[in-house]
From Swiss-Prot:
Residues 482-494 have a biased composition (Polar residues). This is POTE ankyrin domain family member C. Residues 489-538 form a coiled coil. Belongs to the POTE family. The keyword Plastid does not apply. The keyword Coiled coil applies. InterPro entries: Ankyrin_repeat_domain (IPR050657), Ankyrin_rpt (IPR002110), Ankyrin_rpt-contain_sf (IPR036770), CC144C-like_CC_dom (IPR039497). Keywords: ANK repeat, Coiled coil, Repeat.
């Protein structure tokens, strides 16, 4: 809510809220703070108020009329309506038609937890009214006049700076630097900066010369002050910094320069608004985009606990709502009154915003469901692969067992053929071998001896040993080749990863170089501006 005491524009600049002034007459002038101090009379043609209208107003407002209008306090009659309270529908129309003046004028609206005038009337916007100074010639001395109008020759300015204090203040606590910066007199600003005047002096509203230069959009003076080390994070009496005023002016280049010199992107004013929240509140879409790119906090809260999304919904800006939803902001966050962005959209009848929020919520639900389903599928796949591996291993074991008797039979046949070649009882062979071979029972003679693996100085042919060694060599070669192949594949994977890392490093270096180039370009532009100023100054000397 706005504060109770605030600066208001002149009464002539305020539109009449649905002929309320003419009907209430002098009571309007006496009872409404926004009309006090105006030079014009608010009386109707009759010179007094309309009694019938006042009776209707009192009956519909009920106890709110009794609390808000001093003319009703202490009267013997009750101002409460027939229902015992005020008419809500009438109060809603009154608030909607009067706008923020309702919040200023009616004490029953001040300090309440609920918003009575929507997103635009909740904050004190008087900080951004009348950015330039109101100057009267008779209130300024020679130096301040020269700084404000800037039409004094350079030699005379130098003489003035010698004779008077350059940091002297006027009645509004303004220095010559304040006046020159606010009015864009860059030559005077440069002279004062060269003589090392005080940079961060505060005027009667606690504003520095840099704040006034930003507020009045004097770019050249802003750059001069920043280069000489002016502090851009000093808040004024409203809590606004230079970046707040740049956002209010929707000056993206100014905001970029301030951030480059170290402005705090998360500083809050007395309403709890960061520069991003202020841009959303005032529907400055281009600056909001810029601040989002500069990684401003999208979850920052104002003094009512409202996020940027809730403020955008309250202002009815569908484009900013869509821009914030693209950044995956939290839709379910609540303010201090316990309301979400969707509830504000429904109560304000913003149908387009309601559709945007519902579509975003559906997409988020689909993402969550897909993320939850993926691990289950992975587990199923791994379990199926393991079962297939077990089946393959089980099938391979019977095959090996079936191959072993076939190998034994082949060996027995070879032994029988050798026995036939060398005769019935060859030299060096024991009798059990010959008996087993002649009887034809390979299982009784040769096979049991092979199973027990006790050779008894047998002299078998060398061909079997050579074949056995050759098989072992082939197996070892296969294993070596497989290990080499796996090593090669691992090396390829490592090289690919190294290449990816190198590409990522190149991208990072290119981005850093681009940012350095941009900074250098800005500095070059500043130096060129300084050279141009120097040329102009030298031309004045000549």
């Amino acid at each position: 809510m706005v504060t109770e005491v605030c600066s208001m524009p002149a009464a002539s600049a305020v539109k009449k809220p649905f002929d309320l002034r003419s009907k209430m007459g002098k009571w309007f002038h006496h009872r409404f703070p926004c009309c006090k101090g105006s030079g014009k009379s608010n009386m109707g043609t009759s010179g007094d108020h309309d009694d019938s209208f006042m009776k209707m107003l009192r009956s519909k407002m009920g106890k709110c009329c009794h609390h808000c209008f001093p003319c009703c306090r202490g009267s013997g009659t009750s101002n409460v309506g027939t229902s015992g309270d005020h008419d809500n529908s009438f109060m809603k129309t009154l608030r909607s038609k009067m706008g923020k003046w309702c919040c200023h004028c009616f004490p029953c609206c001040r300090g309440s937890g609920k918003s009575n005038v929507g997103a635009w009337g909740d904050y004190d916007d008087s900080a951004f009214m009348e950015p330039r100074y109101h100057v009267r010639r008779e209130d300024l001395d020679k130096l301040h006049r020269a700084a404000w109008w800037g039409k004094v020759p350079r030699k005379d300015l130098i003489v003035m700076l010698r004779d008077t204090d350059m940091n002297k203040r006027d009645k509004q606590k303004r220095t010559a630097l304040h006046l020159a910066s606010a009015n864009g007199n860059s030559e005077v600003v440069q002279l004062l900066l060269d003589r090392r005047c005080q940079l961060n002096v505060l005027d009667n509203k606690k504003r520095t010369a840099l704040i006034k230069a930003v507020q009045c959009q004097e770019d050249e003076c802003v750059l001069m002050l920043l280069e000489h080390g002016a502090d851009q994070n000093i808040p004024d009496e409203y809590g606004n910094t230079t970046l707040h005023y740049a956002v209010h002016n929707e000056d993206k280049l100014m905001a970029k320069a301030l951030l480059l010199y170290g402005a705090d992107i998360e500083s809050k004013n007395k309403c709890g608004l960061t520069p991003l929240l202020l841009g959303v509140h005032e529907q400055k879409q281009q600056v909001v985009k810029f601040l989002i790119k500069k990684k401003a906090n999208l979850n920052a809260l104002d003094r009512y606990g409202r996020t940027a999304l809730i403020l955008a919904v309250c202002c009815g800006s569908a484009s900013i709502v869509n821009l914030l939803l693209e950044q995956n902001v939290d839709v379910s966050s609540q303010d201090l009154s316990g309301q979400t962005a969707r509830e504000y959209a429904v109560s304000s009848h913003h149908h387009v915003i309601c559709e945007l929020l519902s579509d975003y919520k559906e997409k988020q639900m689909l993402k969550i469901s897909s993320e939850n389903s993926n691990p289950e599928q992975d587990l199923k796949l791994t379990s199926e692969e393991e079962s297939q591996r077990l089946k393959v291993s089980e099938n391979s074991q019977p095959e090996k067992m079936s191959q072993e008797p076939e190998i034994n039979k082949d060996c027995d046949r070879e032994v029988e053929e050798e026995i036939k070649k060398h005769g019935s009882n060859p030299v060096g062979l024991p009798e059990n071998l010959t008996n087993g071979a002649s009887a034809g029972n390979g299982d009784d003679g040769l096979i049991p001896q092979r199973r027990s693996r006790k050779p008894e100085n047998q002299q078998f042919p060398d061909t079997e040993n050579e074949e056995y060694h050759s098989d072992e060599q082939n197996d070892t070669r296969k294993q070596l080749s497989e290990e080499q192949n796996t090593g090669i594949s691992q090396d390829e994977i490592l090289t690919n990863k190294q290449k990816q890392i190198e590409v990522a490093e190149k991208k990072m270096n290119s981005e850093l170089s681009l940012s350095h180039k941009k900074e250098e370009d800005l500095l070059r532009e500043n130096s060129m501006l300084q050279e141009e100023i120097a040329m102009l100054i030298s031309g004045d000397w000549n």
